[in-house]
Regions:
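Conserved catalytic/acceptor-binding region of the Class I
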Residues: 134, 141, 146-219
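Conserved alpha-helix/loop element of class I SAM-dependent methyltransferases that forms part
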Residues: 28-50, 64-68
Length: 285
């Protein structure tokens, strides 16, 4: 679920298990806000039929954002490779009565015929895929109708990864590989542009917009514990035995780093707000 780079099985006793439920609590309203910000870049839907593909649908953030914009004359196919995630997505379809169907598919090898969809969205997806998501983009383009629209995004700035790195540097020996090292390449919109062009879209048909995404989180200590649990052990080094004794120091370092990020705001009800920035690409076939 959290894409570890190491085969080590050790985990600190304090670490929360990386389940879809934990992921859902971590992202809170963040994925919905990212999807909504991304969809705002394509304008309103007209009255014609919309056939939307939510690629790597996860728990349904993209689907929720789509249905908030268009209720009628729309069909949504949500695809993901993870069975546990798809089960929750199906529950969300039933609960929210989305006009959607959940299907298990590899984003890099879709089973849909050519020119199936009018729109597709890959929400917070590319940077977790092999080959930087190029193969998935090729499949998205293949399955789009001529004139169809693909919406893709990546984080231009995230407050969470630097906070994780601060904790790792404070509690681990110098030279220990950092979790999610290399993600910073996605902060450059030219990298995202290059990936999309490698996926087959013509350069003049790819437009970019940068969006601020304000995410509400609960108790800061709880949030820091969750993201350190979810990401802290994902480097090539995995979890270290010393991480168990240094657990509180690491979590406190995450808390401190988060409060110092641009856009951080403490709310009155015990909640907090942190700010992400996203590159949103709108590509037309």
């Amino acid at each position: 679920m959290n894409a570890p780079e190491s085969d080590r099985t050790f985990s600190p006793k304090q670490a929360l298990k990386p389940t879809p439920e934990l992921y859902s609590e971590i992202v809170g309203d963040g994925m919905e806000r990212l999807a909504a910000a991304s969809l705002s870049c394509i304008g309103s839907f007209d009255d014609s039929e919309v056939i939307f593909h939510d690629v790597g649908c996860g728990l349904g953030a993209g689907t929720e954002a789509i249905t908030s914009l268009k209720q009628d004359n729309i069909v949504i196919k949500g695809t993901d490779i993870n069975d546990d995630v798809l089960e929750i997505y199906r529950q969300n379809i039933a609960k929210s009565q989305w006009p959607a169907e959940a299907l298990k598919m590899d984003a890099s090898n879709l089973e849909f015929p050519d020119e199936t969809f009018t729109h597709c969205i890959g929400n917070a997806m590319l940077f977790v895929l092999p080959n930087d998501g190029v193969d998935a983009i090729k499949e998205m383009r293949r399955t789009l109708k001529q004139g169809g629209t693909a919406i893709l995004n990546s984080w231009a700035h995230t407050p969470t990864i630097p906070a994780i790195h601060a904790a790792a540097k404070k509690t681990r020996p110098a030279g220990t590989p950092l979790p999610r090292e290399g993600l910073d390449k996605w902060e450059d919109k030219e990298f995202l542009r290059d990936v999309i062009i490698k996926g087959g879209f013509e350069p003049e048909k790819v437009n970019f917009i940068q969006k601020d995404v304000h995410v509400t989180i609960g108790d800061l200590k709880r949030f820091a514990t969750m993201i350190w649990s979810f990401i802290g052990g994902t480097s090539k080094a995995g979890w270290l035995e010393s991480d168990e004794e240094n657990w509180d120091i690491a979590v406190n370092a995450v808390v401190e780093a988060l409060t110092q990020t641009e856009g951080y705001k403490k709310l009155e009800d015990g909640k907090n707000k942190i700010m992400f920035q996203a590159h949103v690409a709108v590509a037309t076939k």
